[in-house]
Amino acid sequence: FLGTINLSLCEQERDADEEKRDEPDESDVEVEKRFLPAALAGIGGILGKLFGK
């Protein structure tokens, strides 16, 4: 049993201009930028619990 893995994502305040997207691809890139660090941190935490002593 690995226990509970708690990930918290930081929510940053953004200007209205930054939220406005002209191209659909731009929003996909922004989602990737937000998701990947959290996913890597979660994977690192799991591996640390599996292989850590």
From Swiss-Prot:
Domain of life assignment: Eukaryota
Family in the record: Belongs to the frog skin active peptide (FSAP) family. Temporin subfamily.
Record-linked InterPro entries: Frog_antimicrobial_propeptide (IPR004275)
Protein purpose: Non-amphipathic mildly cationic alpha-helical antimicrobial peptide with potent activity against Gram-positive (including methicillin-resistant Staphylococcus aureus (MRSA)) and Gram-negative bacteria, and some fungi, as well as against Trypanosoma and Leishmania (both promastigote and amastigote forms). Strongly and selectively perturbs anionic bilayer membranes by interacting with the polar head groups and acyl region of the phospholipids, with formation of regions of two coexisting phases, one phase rich in peptide and the other lipid-rich.
Protein's recorded name: Temporin-SHd
Subcellular location: Secreted; Target cell membrane
UniProt main location, coarse: secreted
Phenylalanine amide carried by residues: 51
Keywords: Amidation, Amphibian defense peptide, Antibiotic, Antimicrobial, Cleavage on pair of basic residues, Cytolysis, Fungicide, Hemolysis, Immunity, Innate immunity, Membrane, Secreted, Signal, Target cell membrane, Target membrane
Chain positions listed as propeptide in the UniProt record: 11-34
UniProt organism field: Pelophylax saharicus
Cellular component terms (Gene Ontology): extracellular region; membrane; other organism cell membrane
